[in-house]
């Protein structure tokens, strides 16, 4: 008993320590850093910030301690509201999230590289949108009928919105990463229903039980019956009985594919689809012109739909899906129905809604508002992709890259593995990080073999060597020395200056060249007929520009500057009056 040893952990000490630190922060006791966000000052302790955020850890560990004064840090990316919630979390371990600040907090957390807060905001958004991402969940949708009257259209519209919230394309289920062992994992949303002909078709015998032949849109085009073939579907999914149909017939939510006749035509081999439980077979009888059909129902506006450019006279049978329909096709239709509902076209909603339907409409409007908030911050969140590592890749799992919130094939997961130890830069490949590190170390490993100039990238050095290997050279008309740069011999594109170097011009050799005119006995050709080739090409100023304007990275200057030079020097110059050699050669210097 005398040698007894026990390692005890008292969890209350954590809360007590955070409470004391928070009180010190609120009273400004021992605060050694001030964080300025949007003009608002937040006092804090460096140790707490450094221990909570990888951004502050990188920032404060690289800065040498020069004085005992408080450090002032300016954060221009994040907002004051978002940073206040984050700094309160650092000192209390409690994160206050609301529908108003979740986007700002998520953006600030991604910038500060706090993956725990990013994941919490991610879960909060999923819970707010009531999204389920269970892979084995079976979605049963109530069947409804699209009637001709406005009241039945309104009921169908509300039912579609409420049923589609669980499969909204905004938070579509992600697929497995395309390359889990590579440098990045990119998962795309299922592109169901976005184009025709995605489903495979196989021969099937006609049967009276699975045919819904009642046309839903009147028109000149005659459509054949719609047939649905189900494979690998257990009867237990339906509870031993079929789903109740609404009124006269079942309405299936599926886009039909055009066909030339009644017979079933196989279109090709089976494709790799996410939902392989069903194989749907749909045929139509269309006119000889085989016009493209429009997927827009008659009770919805066609002006704001993505398919509005198609033939407005073409009709299409749209039927409500059972649980065997593919998830992607239902997602697209519900997205379009929800967009039509929330797009401001009140004339299509018919008479006033019942209280239950009114609540559903308000709930759908709240979802749309949150979606708009996400889209407004999407560009800002995309800028933070570089500062995230493997732990923070879920931030961009459900955020589309495109500008449209309903682009089903634009969902991407961003994962970057290699991080810079000096700044927040991260890269997907080690070679990119190695090249980035040269900006911190000043290393230039690629020297020019001719002139010794060094470059950070090999391609810049190769482009620079073209200056030395080019055929265009400039020869002084007096001493016949060869120069690589036109400026060395006083040649500029579009000017009247002759090929005389600075040394020869200083000895007074340019006087007779200037007064000689063109081609006479005083011209350069007459004075120096064969001393060396004069290879100036006035139509190609690029060689001079590459030598004179190439910066540290080997980048050539803008062509606009050359054009301005040309305009300047093509303008007539007043001849200098005779009166001394200094005045005669002033324009040569």
Swiss-Prot record:
Residues 305-325 have a biased composition (Polar residues). The gene is ZBTB46. PROSITE patterns: BTB (PS50097), ZINC_FINGER_C2H2_1 (PS00028), ZINC_FINGER_C2H2_2 (PS50157). It holds the Pfam family zf-H2C2_2. InterPro entries: BTB/POZ_dom (IPR000210), SKP1/BTB/POZ_sf (IPR011333), Znf_C2H2_sf (IPR036236), Znf_C2H2_type (IPR013087), ZnFinger_BTB_dom_contain (IPR050457). Residues 546-570 have a biased composition (Acidic residues). Sumoylated. Desumoylation by DESI1 reverses transcriptional repression activity. Functions as a transcriptional repressor for PRDM1. It is found in: Nucleus. Residues 31-99 form the BTB domain. Keywords: Isopeptide bond, Metal-binding, Nucleus, Phosphoprotein, Repeat, Transcription, Transcription regulation, Ubl conjugation, Zinc, Zinc-finger. GO terms for biological process: granulocyte differentiation; macrophage differentiation; negative regulation of dendritic cell differentiation; negative regulation of granulocyte differentiation; negative regulation of leukocyte activation; negative regulation of macrophage differentiation; negative regulation of monocyte differentiation; negative regulation of transcription by RNA polymerase II. One of its GO terms (molecular function) is transcription cis-regulatory region binding. Residues 197-207 have a biased composition (Basic and acidic residues). There is a cross-link at residue 229 (Glycyl lysine isopeptide (Lys-Gly) (interchain with G-Cter in SUMO2)). A zinc finger (C2H2-type) spans 418-436, 446-468. The modification Phosphoserine is found at residue 234. It comes from Homo sapiens (Human). Residues 173-330, 512-589 are annotated as: Disordered. This is Zinc finger and BTB domain-containing protein 46. One of its GO terms (cellular component) is chromatin.
């Amino acid at each position: 008993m005398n040698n007894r040893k026990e390692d005890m952990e008292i969890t209350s000490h954590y809360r007590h320590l955070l409470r004391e630190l928070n009180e010190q922060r609120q009273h400004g006791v021992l605060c050694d850093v001030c964080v300025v966000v949007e003009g608002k000052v937040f006092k804090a302790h460096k140790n707490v910030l450094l221990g909570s955020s990888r951004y502050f850890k990188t920032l404060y560990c690289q800065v040498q301690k020069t004085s005992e004064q408080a450090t002032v840090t300016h954060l221009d990316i994040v907002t004051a509201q978002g940073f206040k919630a984050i700094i309160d979390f650092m000192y209390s371990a409690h994160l206050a999230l609301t529908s108003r600040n979740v986007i700002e907090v998520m953006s600030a957390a991604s910038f500060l590289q706090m993956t725990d807060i990013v994941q919490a905001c991610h879960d909060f958004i999923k819970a707010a949108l009531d999204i389920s991402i269970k892979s084995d969940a079976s979605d049963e949708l109530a069947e409804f009928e699209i009637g001709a009257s406005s009241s039945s259209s309104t009921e169908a519209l509300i039912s579609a919105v409420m049923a589609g919230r669980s499969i909204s394309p905004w938070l579509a289920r992600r697929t497995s990463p395309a390359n889990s062992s590579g440098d990045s994992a990119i998962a795309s949303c299922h592109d169901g229903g976005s184009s025709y002909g995605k489903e495979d078709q196989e021969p099937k015998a006609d049967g009276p039980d699975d045919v819904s032949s009642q046309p839903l849109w009147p028109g000149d085009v005659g459509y054949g019956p719609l047939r649905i073939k189900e494979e690998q579907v257990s009867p237990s999914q339906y509870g031993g009985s079929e789903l109740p149909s609404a009124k006269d017939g079942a309405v299936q939510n599926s886009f039909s594919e055009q066909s030339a006749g009644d017979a079933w035509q196989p279109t090709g081999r089976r494709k790799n689809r996410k939902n392989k439980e069903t194989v749907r077979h749909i045929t139509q009888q269309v006119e000889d012109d085989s016009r493209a059909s429009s997927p827009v129902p008659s009770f919805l506006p066609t002006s704001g739909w993505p398919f509005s450019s198609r033939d407005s006279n073409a009709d299409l049978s749209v039927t409500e899906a059972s649980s065997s329909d593919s998830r992607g096709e239902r997602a697209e239709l519900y997205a379009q129905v929800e967009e039509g509902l929330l797009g401001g076209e009140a004339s299509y909603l018919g008479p006033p809604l019942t209280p239950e339907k009114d609540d559903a409409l308000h709930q759908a409007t709240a979802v749309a508002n949150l979606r708009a908030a996400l889209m407004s911050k999407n560009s800002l969140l995309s800028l933070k992709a570089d500062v995230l590592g493997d732990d923070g890749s879920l931030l961009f799992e459900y955020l589309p890259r495109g500008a449209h919130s309903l682009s089903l094939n634009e969902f991407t997961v961003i994962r970057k593995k290699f991080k810079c130890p000096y700044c927040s830069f991260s890269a997907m490949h080690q070679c990119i990080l190695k090249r980035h590190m040269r900006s911190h170390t000043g290393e230039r490993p690629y020297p020019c073999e001719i002139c010794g100039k060094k470059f950070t990238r090999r391609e810049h050095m190769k482009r620079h060597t073209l200056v030395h290997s080019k055929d265009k050279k400039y020869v002084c008309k007096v001493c016949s020395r060869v120069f690589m740069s036109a400026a060395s011999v006083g040649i500029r594109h579009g000017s009247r200056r002759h090929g005389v170097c600075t040394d020869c011009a200083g000895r007074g050799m340019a006087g007779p060249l200037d007064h000689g005119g063109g081609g006479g006995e005083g011209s350069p050709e007459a004075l120096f007929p064969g001393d060396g080739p004069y290879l100036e090409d006035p139509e190609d100023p690029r060689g001079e520009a590459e030598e004179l304007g190439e910066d540290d990275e080997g980048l050539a200057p803008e062509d606009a500057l050359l054009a301005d030079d040309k305009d300047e020097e093509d303008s007539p110059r007043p001849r200098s009056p005779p009166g001394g050699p200094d005045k005669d050669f002033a324009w040569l210097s």
